[in-house]
Amino acid sequence: MASSPVAPVVLVILDGWGYREETYGNAIASAYTPVIDSLWQAYPHTLIHTSGKAVGLPKGQMGNSEVGHLNIGAGRIVPQELVRISDAVEEGSLFSNPVLVRLCQTVKERNGKLHFIGLCSAGGVHSHIDHLYGLVELAKRHGLPACIHVITDGRDTPPRDAAGVLEELEQRLKTSGCGRIVTVSGRYYAMDRDRRWERTEAAYRVMTSNEHIQPLRAVDVARQSYAQDIGDEFIVPTRIAAGAVEPGDGVVFFNFRPDRARQLTQAFIDPNFSGFERALITPLDFVTFTQYDASFNCGVAFPPQNLSHILGEVIAEHGLKQLRAAETEKYAHVTYFFNGGLEEPFPGEDRILIPSPMVTTYDQAPAMSALAVTQAVKKAIEKQEYALVVVNFANSDMVGHTGKLAATIQAIETVDRCVGVLVEAATKVGGTLLITADHGNAEYMIDEDGNPWTAHTTNPVPFILVEGEKRKVPGHGGHVILRKDGCLADIAPTILEILELPQPLEMTGRSLIVSAPYEMRLNRTPVSLKI
């Protein structure tokens, strides 16, 4: 490791900070953001794509934090699990998947039941309802009773979307003649990722007990919740029919995104589980759609795709130090997802985890832990040890998901101030900053009907290059512009160019930096900026 002072490249990821011209319902346009506004005016900037085919998703599919960080860290467009699994359903290879076939055979030999647990929506961020329909057909082909444990969305979809989804699901099950909905739980409970075990427990108890059955249709559970002003995300776990997870059964958790599926999975499979009191259900065959954690002892229907020569790996191979920093809500994204699904850090990779505030929803604490993250990263920059610093600010995404416009504006203004601190710290040591986002959210919070919008968007995001005195852009100096057709996969090649490191062949992204035309250089006026 180099001992001389290092001028870092600082990648600042403003989670959920999209770009949209329209100001109505736009928390970012409504907020007071003097730092970002000044940087946008003074430095090379562009808009980049973060959704659909630009990040390996189907055309028109909104991006998300997992996909965003995966593409940024990989330096290439990574085909996403949504596409991979959807293709398996459409082409029929799902029905010959060896892990799923073996599960069905084992359950049938035991005269057990097959359970499908997952987020039931077309959001495409954590799961897709079409994948459940494929699983129901799988159960039908094997002559197995299928018990469906619905997790309702309301976060990656409109807050009251579940009623329509459940109506269609009930009709599809009736037509199929296979499968029944036995429990309904909001994702707030079943998909917690912050070790609020009381939430996970509420969903787990309903799924594993036939007590307290409320003889309702699933759609009626949603409608009764709406009548109490409870949206899909917060539907209280409810059992509506017999069909608890019991010894001899098999389970498929069909979420493909790992982070919010881990806690509930642990409760089912971990013999040393300590989140809450429960007896381990055994024998129980448990399959997850993707690998939720390398340490989990369960089947995986779609094993991970290996990515080689990603950004963190290249930095480490050249003997340089790097730092990843975020609060709890986005820590996995700057580490696990940024590193292509690897849990272990690369040599020379340090990590800073700042706990997120323990509140029910983040509109109650719009600043979240941004100030603490900022101070920790500022100190790290001042050490001049790291060639690359990656920091994520969760506020505009996490508060944006609440649908509370005023709170989201506060969140954005907090982040703007934090960016100012990091710009000052980085430029003081000659470092260069790249300021961008992983997907849109907070720029669109009210839909065309005037209702709160809590999901992500397909809008582009800003990308700003703040060039430092000791970390100049090679061969260009101040005479640079940024391409207009870029995407998240282009960020890693841009960083490598600034660090003067070779771009591996596996990295198919292209640097966003291009030389400005001669005429533009002549007309460019130097800007004096003080933050």
Curated annotation (Swiss-Prot):
Name the record gives this protein: 2,3-bisphosphoglycerate-independent phosphoglycerate mutase
Might you name a Gene Ontology BP term for this protein?
A: glucose catabolic process
Query: What positions constitute the catalytic site?
Result: S65
Q: Name one GO cellular component term.
A: cytosol
What is the scientific name of the source organism?
A: Thermosynechococcus vestitus (strain NIES-2133 / IAM M-273 / BP-1)
Q: Tell me, what is one Gene Ontology molecular-function annotation carried by this entry?
A: phosphoglycerate mutase activity
* UniProt record similarity statement: Belongs to the BPG-independent phosphoglycerate mutase family.
Role this protein plays: Catalyzes the interconversion of 2-phosphoglycerate and 3-phosphoglycerate.
